[in-house]
UniProtKB/Swiss-Prot annotation:
Self-assembles to form a helical, filamentous nucleocapsid. The capsid proteins wrap around the DNA and maintain it in an A-form by non-specific desolvation and specific coordination of the DNA phosphate groups by positively charged residues. This certainly protects the viral DNA under conditions such as the extreme desiccation of its host. It comes from the Viruses. Gene3D superfamilies: 1.20.58.800. The keyword Signal does not apply. The keyword DNA-binding applies. Keywords: DNA-binding, Virion. GO terms for cellular component: helical viral capsid. It is found in: Virion. The lineage of its organism: Viruses, Adnaviria, Zilligvirae, Taleaviricota, Tokiviricetes. GO terms for molecular function: DNA binding. This is Major capsid protein.
Length: 134
């Protein structure tokens, strides 16, 4: 579900690094890394799953409103998750606007996506059809 990078605090990053670093002194490195990193990764996953689940639900509602059915829904669901990951990673502002504009251009040319629906998806995720959240 939540694929890619999600925002993490310094303490979360340090906890995961420390779990990996301490494992390298053990001969069974792989199993030690997995057992040490597992709680940190699980906590990060549990923190971020609700965000991305709500994105899927909100985008699904928009797609139903526009009458998009079948496999075409996957195009817009994928776009919505990319926008949500970008918002989660880089926050709002000009960088997000540039990323959204690039993604929209790509989805329009590669998947023949409807620009109005893409704008509605951006609006439901960011609160603004342009992606700029002040």
């Amino acid at each position: 579900m939540a694929k890619g990078h999600t925002s993490r605090s310094y303490s979360q990053r340090y906890a995961k690094w420390q779990a990996k670093f301490n494992a390298f002194s053990n001969p069974t490195v792989a199993s030690t890394i997995l057992s040490n990193v597992s709680p940190v990764a699980q906590q990060n996953f549990q923190t971020n799953v609700p965000k991305f689940t709500s994105v899927n639900e909100n985008v699904s509602a928009v797609l139903t409103q526009y009458g998009i059915t079948g496999p075409n829904r996957a195009i817009y669901q994928g776009f919505g998750l990319k926008v949500a990951r970008a918002l989660n990673r880089i926050g709002s502002g000009p960088a997000l606007v540039n990323m959204i504009n690039g993604l929209k251009g790509y989805y329009i040319s590669a998947f023949n996506a409807n620009p109005q629906v893409l704008d509605a998806v951006v609006n439901i995720i960011t609160g603004s059809p342009t992606g700029y959240v002040s």
